[in-house]
């Protein structure tokens, strides 16, 4: 089609749909014996958008994956943490089932179940939340609890979390209200002491109080397109009762709180049993017995714990699990670097002893899976720097000595004479 003002005969042209002449519209698009103006094109687009909105809910209703399907998808990206994956699969399924049935079922109002993830650094808390959002195709944003303060103090206001979520979906409120918010380092906003203080705790208990309504469900007023708030401005109204909040933290020292309760015989939930001091449980076993009273003792206020009814604990990753993480998930670290090298036309091979050495280093650093990338990056840095300037390299081999910094990666060339020259 072409943009026309007049045909070859100089006749005045009219839109075939609305009848307006070429002088009454900005553009007139010509087809075989027909014309359409820019106004009719806009109208057609609006009609199509409305129809898509009406069809979308029916499509979404049939697209909700079952807990088994959610769990299998998580298995593709997250190694281990079987109990946490099962808890998350059920909680997420129930949350979105509630949304699709209008918060009620046979007159019974369905409550909201936000999630608390407890586990050491690098155990997969953030990855689980990100993978869920990707599977469900919903907006996802992360917030760091350590940067949050009460409104009116220097720092990030809790409502900025909703603004970030809106930014992820181009300020589409309906999309944002189906999103997932992950708040990391939630343990860092614990109350500084068991006793209420006369001084204001604006980054601890104060933030917990500020988050209460947001997590439970309120209508947050957010400035459009990230502007500052002022009285004459119209705000976007976002209903947070439909947003799934997942809070995560390492909760260092919580195992000692649980151990003290269990040893003194006050544990009654999650199959907690009285243990002698000589019979020490592992940190993972203790965290699995967490009760609300332990979290209160740690420094979370009771009202805040009540807004996070689903609790999942993650274990510290073993050396074997770290090796699996390096090679088994769909986006495993070794696969990522192999794809990167393939873009240069070069194969990359990690020998088994190299994977063992990477896992041992990460265990020594106590950074969990998060530390794996920095170890691999350091080992491959010089090779990635030189490779684009080199010719005839077909393969790069990484073994244990490369990871430990004792030798350089083995380069295999396409031409034997080039390899011989490299080895001299």
From Swiss-Prot:
SMART domains: AAA (SM00382), ClpB_D2-small (SM01086), zf-C4_ClpX (SM00994). SUPFAM superfamilies: Glucocorticoid receptor-like (DNA-binding domain), P-loop containing nucleoside triphosphate hydrolases. Zn(2+) binds at residues 15, 18, 37, 40. It comes from the Bacteria. PANTHER family: ATP-DEPENDENT CLP PROTEASE ATP-BINDING SUBUNIT CLPX-LIKE, MITOCHONDRIAL (PTHR48102:SF7), ATP-DEPENDENT CLP PROTEASE ATP-BINDING SUBUNIT CLPX-LIKE, MITOCHONDRIAL-RELATED (PTHR48102). ATP-dependent specificity component of the Clp protease. It directs the protease to specific substrates. Can perform chaperone functions in the absence of ClpP. This is ATP-dependent Clp protease ATP-binding subunit ClpX. The lineage of its organism: Bacteria, Pseudomonadati, Pseudomonadota, Gammaproteobacteria, Enterobacterales.
